Amino acid sequence: MVTSSGEVANLSTKNIIKNHYRNTLKFKTIRGKLKVMFDDGKRQESFTLSLRMKKDEAIWLSATLSLVKVYITPQKVSFYNKLDNTYFEGDFSLISKFLGTELDFEKVQNLLIGNALFDLKNERFNSVIQNKNYALTPKRDFELFKRLFLLDPFHFKVKQQRLEQSGKNRLLTIDYPAYQEITGQAFPKNVEIKAEEVNKKTTIQIEYRKITFNENVRFPFKIPSGYKEIKI
């Protein structure tokens, strides 16, 4: 919350968390475009994806000409790549390994819409005002696993979330540099994901375009025959 003088108001930790969930995005479906830039230090790529999402049920991504398709449900992750005739069908371990932290459907959905990855209501947090944002850190964090959540004082959506595994020298930082207002709700305009390990850094930048809510959406997905399965 910002005062009339432009200062960030002092709020209790309880009220900060309450406002975060009070401002959770309300939607049944999402449709739009993503411009994605990928850089892992060895290669750089830029591409556009179509996005369709049904709350708590499905996330669907498709590249131009359906060359790559991704279909995520709470039960499994599936994708295929027509460029190299490969496919994957399995649990969330592939995405978790890629970003260096344990993920499930709810966490992936939260990441995309600007919610905290973890349920802030299930723990006790300390809060301070840091760089004009509300900073939350758990009073008791997981062993060898540190977390930080920065919430924007205007709409209480996530500005940054950091997950650090010092024992494994892993750091996942998810930034939300800008939000846009769509039908009266704050929705990310940009997301920047940085996954760092020893001698390895992967950066993914996402720009949302033409986002609409609550349209009828379909999720066409069928793995072509003859493709080689990716095993992990």
Q: Could you tell me what each predicted segment is?
A:
Residues 1-43, 231-232:
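N-terminal leader/targeting segments and the immediate start of mature chains
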Residues 29-34, 46-49, 63-65, 72-74, ...:
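Extended beta-sheet lipid-handling architectures
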Residues 6-12, 24-26, 30, 52-56, ...:
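The feature marks either
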Residues 58-106:
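An acidic-aromatic
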Residues 125-232:
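Gly/Pro-enriched, hydrophobic low-complexity segments
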Residues 22-30, 42-45, 52, 70, ...:
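Edge/loop elements at the starts and ends of beta-strands within beta-rich repeat scaffolds
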Residues 96-139:
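Hydrophobic, well-structured mid-protein blocks that either form specific transmembrane helices
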